[in-house]
Regions:
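Extreme N-terminal starter segment of soluble prokaryotic enzymes
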Residues: 2-5
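Acetyl-CoA-dependent GNAT
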Residues: 11-12, 19-102, 107-109, 120-122, ...
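Conserved catalytic-core motifs of GNAT/GCN5-like acyltransferases
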Residues: 59, 138-139, 154-172
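Active-site acidic-Proline motif in GNAT/NAT acetyltransferases
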Residues: 107-113, 141-142
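Residues forming the Rossmann-fold NAD(P)(H) cofactor-binding site
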Residues: 117
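Conserved GNAT acetyl-CoA-binding A-motif
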Residues: 127-138
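Helix-turn-helix
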Residues: 146
Length: 179
């Protein structure tokens, strides 16, 4: 198995990062059910297995990466066999104690090899050295692989936005308290 190397993203990485396969497949989704009663709104998410696997389109414009990366607080690139195989973007928003993971992408041919895990660990290390108290990871409710990864690393569901992405997909937010 090849070693995963992580480093801060540089401008020369961007073309290859934009060319990565950003979409994923999912066999289940987190389905939102809203119930509205007088003086009360109840939101429930339940995992629903689909009759067949669906392709989950990446919710951000991957071609805007060349413009957006300079606005990120930090961006890591994962390298295997001298190729860029994934990336993770971090953004300090609002309060200085919270960092958002806005992008976590691993090329399809390199998934299930520990790349996303290594990127998440680097994000946590970066946030801790900057004395942040919380990481928030965003993902689509259709992206069960990302939901499972968040849960595996101790992230807990902390909210949603039902029209967060341009394609109107539901965004889920998972957070992790740092030491």
């Amino acid at each position: 198995m090849s070693e995963i190397q992580l480093r801060p993203t540089v401008a020369t990485d961007l073309q290859k990062l934009m060319a990565l396969e950003h979409n994923t497949n999912s066999e289940s989704v987190w389905q939102l059910e809203l119930k509205r009663n007088t003086g009360q709104v109840s939101a429930t998410f339940r995992e629903v297995r689909l009759p067949r696997s669906i392709q989950v389109e990446y919710p951000h414009n991957k071609f805007a990466l060349a413009d957006d990366w300079v606005r990120k607080s930090m961006m890591y690139t994962a390298i295997m066999n001298n190729d860029q195989v994934g990336y993770l973007s971090l953004l300090e928003r609002g309060t200085a104690s919270v960092v958002w993971i806005t992008d976590l992408v691993v090329d399809a041919s390199f998934r299930r090899r520990g790349v996303a895990s290594a990127l998440l660990a680097s994000a946590q290390g970066w946030a801790e050295t900057r004395q942040h108290r919380r990481l928030i990871l965003e993902m689509q409710s259709k992206n069960l692989p990302a939901i499972r990864l968040a849960q595996k690393f101790g992230y807990e569901f902390c909210g949603y936005n039902d029209h967060y992405y341009l394609n109107q997909d539901v965004a889920l937010f998972f957070s992790k308290t740092l030491k």
